[in-house]
């Protein structure tokens, strides 16, 4: 909806081009913190750099927490109102309607995740021990625990992705090559560009991928991820009309995450570099962390907030902050 787009645009404008997060300094360089390169900085082996970047970014965002909260809550209230107008029992039911999924599936997912948090916590303990820390802080979660001085060029990324996706067959591989040759991917990072990676598609035109490429294996994996969406959109356009070509959000990540898994498995199977094999394995673990445990943590926050809004209660920045903090304590 237009309201949803406005919510996203306000957030992206603030995070990516308006807020100034300052700089972090090391013995080698001074680096400006942006919403795009923050995740790279947080992989630093220097804990002081990680802590400095974390405190500067989060404190700056905290200055505008009421604006972010009001923007989020306004969007959620609109979604809740539309669910009520359309006679859904809850907002969650309305959001799951197009996927034909009962909300009991979501409840079951959260229960299973919470029941198996010991697996995730065992991984966090491994990170803590690998870093030689007595206590693990939030800014330690993405610290590089492997010796990762490897750098990948765009051409390296294209080669690895091309080789890994040959497993799908000639048609799929040809579309991947077409995407590279016709420059479907925007790799560069610059001020104002959205952080992370995205794929967008308009019926009748080829998909476009936006990413922020810094030369790490994770960046190669991100390109593979978004190209999974791109090929999916491309083939779906060929097989469907413009009213039916879009896929359902519940299964949208299948095409993309499968590509990341295939890429990492390809490297593990074919590389002769032991460290690169470990980096690829580490990437697989991060996929589980980000797309299962972290996603469910954020989903629980959203679900709790929608329940209150559906019942006519008021939520604000303090509620959102305290709730995500309490949920994080359970997970971590």
Spans of features found by a protein language model:
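His/Asp/Glu-rich acidic catalytic environments and adjacent acidic regulatory segments
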Residues: 1-104, 108, 112-115, 163-164, ...
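A metal-dependent hydrolase signature that marks the N-terminal structural subdomain at the beginning
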Residues: 91-171
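Post-HExxH zinc-binding segment in Zn-dependent metallohydrolases
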Residues: 247-274, 290
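Conserved small/polar residues in nucleotide/adenosyl-binding loops
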Residues: 330-332
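Auxiliary, metal-adjacent structural segments of Zn-dependent hydrolase domains
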Residues: 140, 147-203, 216-217
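Post-HEXXH active-site segment of zinc metalloproteases
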Residues: 233-254
